[in-house]
Amino acid sequence: MDFLEIVGQVPLKGEVEISGAKNSALPILAATLLSHQEVKIKSLPQVVDIKAMALLLQNLGAELEWLNPHTLQLSAKSLHHTEATYDLVRKMRASILVLGPLLARFKECLVSLPGGCAIGARPVDLHLKAMQQLGAEIKIEQGYIHAKAPKGLKGNDILFDKISVTGTENALMAASLAKGITRIINAAKEPEIAQLCAFLQSGGVEIEGVDSSELKIRGVESDALNLKDIQIIPDRIEAGTCLCVGAITNSQLKINHIIPNHIQAITDKLIEIGFPLDIQENSIEIYPAKKRQAFEITTKEYPGFPTDMQAQFMALATQCLGTSIIEETLFENRFMHASELQRLGANISLKTNVATISGSTELTGSDVMATDLRASSALVLAALVAKGVSRVHRIYHLDRGYERLEDKVNALGAKVLRLKEK
């Protein structure tokens, strides 16, 4: 198992290239199961979750070829079977995304209940209910979802009680081969969903209401789609994290290959804290703040402040003057990084879903342990400003969603080593 050894308080300067968005790539990879045509996907990030999804598709019988480290050519023309087994699914919650496409195209599938970050309840019930609304019969037996629709899926209204990104994606993919019209009400509005819509539209699916909370899908009257090649959008969470590298170290950094509109909630908050930003069409440059003010954040669904940036801003709050308040409204149990930040000297108090951070605090290097994907990046951020040396353990969490984060910060001047645990 690897860990990162980080020397803190090293001056940083330079430019960072942002990778493709993991959270866009995963549903798009799953959606290739709907196609009987070869598809090329570009700008895939080299992260563990993407490799796991590629392996799952290969296990189902898809033909895969990596044309370069970030481009995958694949064909799901003839699959061996429609069973997503536990050993392939257990490490990644996004594997539930194969449910909709497998069911829609092959009328029956067996999908293991998924794994992934342990950050509270992420019920698959919403996915199952959506499939049932389209006419599927669902049984859960021995840890597997057994879904079948012998006569195929039929368009219907799907109302999500709670906004669900992966639930919306699964419903979209299933509806694309359902007979007639499906309406998804209370749909998630993330940019990653807009890109999935564009991908499905390239295969002939008619979708109205993209970027809104109500999607109207007219399914294609065929047994499969003819999906076209696609390039994955930049990762807005990696972009936000790299801006926080500049913010927490109070450095001048330029973040390239981004879509600034996708991270407006993040840039608005950085400006409020005191950072001058130069926002261009596909880059943002952050400059040192004269004074970093405390702030308040409440996580919300897109376009609100993303829950996936909450941990990074908690690390940043330790360097801001005054009392910052972070309220987490989307997941319970998502403050596990707080106790690890406290090991570095952070002054944080927790009350249910609200964290209060008093700053500014001088952090001191220590051994800390990553508990989930975004928490791991928060610990890296804190270690960059801590006095002395920190070691961040269990970075397999980090590798699930960040492509070579240590290489990217080292290119800015940081001193980060990836080492093996003894």
From Swiss-Prot:
It comes from Helicobacter pylori (strain J99 / ATCC 700824) (Campylobacter pylori J99). Keywords: Cell cycle, Cell division, Cell shape, Cell wall biogenesis/degradation, Cytoplasm, Peptidoglycan synthesis, Pyruvate, Transferase. CDD domains: UdpNAET. One of its GO terms (cellular component) is cytoplasm. One of its GO terms (biological process) is peptidoglycan biosynthetic process. It is found in: Cytoplasm. The keyword Transcription regulation does not apply. The active site is at residue 117. Pathway: Cell wall biogenesis; peptidoglycan biosynthesis. UDP-N-acetyl-alpha-D-glucosamine binds at residues 93, 122-126, 308, 330. The modification 2-(S-cysteinyl)pyruvic acid O-phosphothioketal is found at residue 117. Cell wall formation. Adds enolpyruvyl to UDP-N-acetylglucosamine. One of its GO terms (molecular function) is UDP-N-acetylglucosamine 1-carboxyvinyltransferase activity. Belongs to the EPSP synthase family. MurA subfamily. This is UDP-N-acetylglucosamine 1-carboxyvinyltransferase.
